[in-house]
Amino acid sequence: MADTATTASAASAAASASNASSDAPPFQLGKPRFQQTSFYGRFRHFLDIIDPRTLFVTEKRLREAVQLLEDYKHGTLRPGVTNEQLWSAQKIKQAILHPDTNEKIFMPFRMSGYIPFGTPIVVGLLLPNQTLASTVFWQWLNQSHNACVNYANRNATKPSPASKFIQGYLGAVISAVSIAVGLNVLVQKANKFTPATRLLVQRFVPFPAVASANICNVVLMRYGELEEGIDVLDADGNLVGSSKIAARHALLETALTRVVLPMPILVLPPIVMSMLEKTALLQARPRLLLPVHSLVCLAAFGLALPLAISLFPQMSEIETSQLEPEIARATSSRTVVYNKGL
């Protein structure tokens, strides 16, 4: 009876908010504002997720947002609250608080802080004339930041041993550093390259190093899913079973996303900078090289992140005919969905 009353209260609150505002779509607690079935809808959704303006939300504003959502949930919204205000409150809460623990995520490790705090690392990765020490440092710092973001935004509903995260972190660092150092040594020993060509090629070394490290991290962190399978749900959200085939699809989609993500970030800036460095402005004012380089990296990062994470929906759909026979027998639905993970 309590659940029914809560649902009725939320419906009443939704109707009240809907009447107060027709500009925004009707508010749904815990649901995305934009449709997740299209790439554009997912792109708009993730633009909200990574919006750096939420980094400047005050403690008072956060408490107000949380309270507004609680009022909506219990049907006690004050008159005049709009759908836009409710969507804004949910955006703030989701950007700052962990969905499972309701604890504040440390600012540099929030998704909204990924670009502001990650851009200096990208700039460091792409600096020309890297030494062995600087190559190792920037690759280590990049993988350390990625590991902290992954851990801070992990699924906390099930206890997970810290050893799993340490294993994934060490594997990513070792693969990134070894590939970056190895490629730099090969480029240095390539006698066919002119000094200018060698410098240009060296600028592209971070991409294969970071991409391979990202794949290594996904496999090491989530290999257990391949052995045990992941939950698949029907259209009503009911658990159908656990599927190893769905786990393979989830890991493939996640790995592909993590390869696509660094591509524009680590490939576009070297191309753009190689052209900008030839302009009269930068040749006459070499001190502008680093600021311009930083702006180019920031623009590439800001474009690449929402595009990459919008490639696949968070809840991916797959036909039961492609899964294990026991999954197909356990449901009358033609398709099921699974969470692909971060």
Swiss-Prot record:
Reactions this protein catalyses: citrate(in) = citrate(out)
NCBIfam families per UniProt: mtc
Tissue spec: Specifically expressed in the brain.
Predominant location category: mitochondrion
The protein, known as: Sideroflexin-5
Family: Belongs to the sideroflexin family.
UniProt keyword annotation of Transport present: yes
Domain of life: Eukaryota
Cellular component terms (Gene Ontology): mitochondrial inner membrane; mitochondrion
Gene Ontology terms describing biological process: amino acid transport; citrate transport; mitochondrial transmembrane transport; positive regulation of cold-induced thermogenesis
Keywords: Amino-acid transport, Membrane, Mitochondrion, Mitochondrion inner membrane, Transmembrane, Transmembrane helix, Transport
One Pfam family linked to the record: SFXNs
Compartments, record wording: Mitochondrion inner membrane
Name of the gene this protein is made from: Sfxn5
Organism: Rattus norvegicus (Rat)
UniProt-recorded Gene Ontology molecular function terms: citrate transmembrane transporter activity; monoatomic ion transmembrane transporter activity
Annotated segments matching region Disordered: 1-29
Membrane-related topology note: Multi-pass membrane protein
Functional description taken from the UniProt entry: Mitochondrial amino-acid transporter. Transports citrate. Does not act as a serine transporter: not able to mediate transport of serine into mitochondria. In brown adipose tissue, plays a role in the regulation of UCP1-dependent thermogenesis probably by supporting mitochondrial glycerol-3-phosphate utilization.
Biased composition (Low complexity): 1-24
Transmembrane portions of the chain: 105-125, 165-185, 256-276, 289-309
